[in-house]
Amino acid sequence: MRVASDLRSMEIRRIGIIMNGVTGRMGTNQHLIRSIKAIRDQGGIKIGSDLTIMPDPILTGRNATKLAALAERTGIKRYTTDLDAALADPNDEVFFDASGTLQRAGFIERAVKAGKAIYCEKPTAVETSEALRLAKLCEAAGVKNGVVQDKLWLNGLRKFKMMRDQGFFGRILSVRGEFGYWVFTGEDQDQPIQRPSWNYRKEDGGGIIIDMLCHWQYVISQLFGPIQSLSCTGATHIPQRVDEQGKTYKCTTDDSCYATFALENGIICQFNSSWTVRVRRDDLLTMQVDGTHGSAIVGLRKCWVQSLGTTPRPIWNPDIEQPIDFFAGWQEVPDTTTYDNAFKIQWEEFLKHVVLDTPFPYTLREGAKGVQLAELGLQSWAERRWLDVPELE
């Protein structure tokens, strides 16, 4: 009888979510299938023994055929091409946007006017002034808001943070980040492109600097400390590519970025980001972190560490084969918990923020800091000089 009573007392709190522009790869896979659908499939977000938050999405977009196909594939019953009608429904409290960067401001403005809580992909804009304007718009309206900062919940970064918090590294000295892979140009039909063509057109909001420096801003700030200044060089190594329709087009923005960040605490971070690099490392993103008492190699899912006591003593001698196996001296940090999908974890945090007013520091204002860093990176490249990173207004 107690079990039946407990079930009757369990409140299921429905929360309607307008999911705009999720027919693309990232929106479909990470946000819809592996986040919202996964939350629904697990029975919602359980808060203690008396509350469950259950997301109820409605898919919105311009292409009714794509929306219908996605709805059928995922079992989502609600979809529409009429965004205004969706925004007018008071039963849907959250607006999520994964559309193109250049379209994001207009969608956010409409959703804020409708009183919705705002959650969106990064970058929130391509200019700092616009990103900050959107943040202030949400703040003035008093609506809860957040931006995707998924990499903070990746397994490898969480393992590193645990070791850092336990004091393993001593004083951290430097960080070397390598990100990227070879994106096929589309010129060979047996090597189809694996990134949309708009990524290589400035006029469509493309460019690896605006894309990846937004990520590095929050990764560096959260794991290592506030960024004081930066130096950045970009490049367009591949001048032309072939688009989804088989047409050759000119690349009008950067496909590679080489940036150095000086932090307020003295740590130096170097991050190379490229869609024109072939991978011979542990993962598509790796960071080497060196400290006085230990070092780490941080990947997306794994993390390896080496302590001061197990550091080998190499001697420079190019006339003989290297006697030290440098890979053998590293220890993998084991899984000590169950690691969920990074996007899903942040979705759960945001929905709890909306329903229960729990803290959620990853706001549009924080997202504007990423846009600011990217814009400063572009300026540094254009002017060929170091730039300080000022506080946002």
Feature locations, PLM:
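Short acidic low-complexity segments
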Residues: 49, 78-90
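Glycine-rich, aromatic-lined ligand/substrate-binding cores of catalytic
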Residues: 211, 218-230, 234-242, 247-295, ...
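C-terminal capping/lid region of NAD(P)-dependent oxidoreductase domains
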Residues: 143, 170-174, 379-393
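Hydrophobic residues in well-ordered beta-strands that form the structural core
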Residues: 120-121, 145-147, 176, 271, ...
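Predominantly a Rossmann-like dinucleotide-binding segment in NAD(P)-dependent oxidoreductases
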Residues: 151-250, 384
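Beta-strand-loop-alpha-helix segment that lines the small-molecule cofactor/substrate pocket
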Residues: 93-94, 100-101, 105-152, 167
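C-terminal glycine/acidic-rich active-site capping loop/insertion
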Residues: 242-245, 249-250, 258, 262-263, ...
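N-terminal Rossmann-like dinucleotide-binding module
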Residues: 4-74
